[in-house]
């Protein structure tokens, strides 16, 4: 069954604004939300990278301490309904919306992290530039490749927006 990600229009607008602000550098953030069923993720909030985030032409690393405090705060405010559900970041001037090797490694780390509690993290990549950012949505999951080896499988997802 196809994967679907619901995201508020206001979150998409905030992502595009941040992407255009840092257009030559990678930028990104964190998503809070929930899975309404096995194939439908609902994003309710985006947490930006924070003031101490590191942005370069080829990588983005959020301000982890600030990010975690915002995740904790939103979790409490939501009545413990919304949890960490994934991330987004830009690939400036990229032609392909496929997750990079680094993106797959990041997904593996998230999936294996007990603190994240995200066995199927969402990853949205904004590719292009200020005039033409194109979103590409993925769901990550570990699959067994052989008896002892695991690999990250990424499944494309459809993005639908909603008004809040």
From Swiss-Prot:
Domain MPN: 5-142
UniProt cross-references to InterPro entries, sorted A to Z: CAP3, JAB_dom_prok, MPN
Pfam families referenced in this protein's UniProt entry, alphabetically: Prok-JAB
Keywords: Hydrolase, Metal-binding, Metalloprotease, Plasmid, Protease, Zinc
Extent of the signal sequence: none
PROSITE patterns: MPN
GO BP: any one term: proteolysis
One GO molecular-function entry: metallopeptidase activity
Residues bound to Zn(2+): 89, 91, 103
Family classification: Belongs to the peptidase M67B family.
Protein name: Probable metalloprotease y4qB
Species this protein is from: Sinorhizobium fredii (strain NBRC 101917 / NGR234)
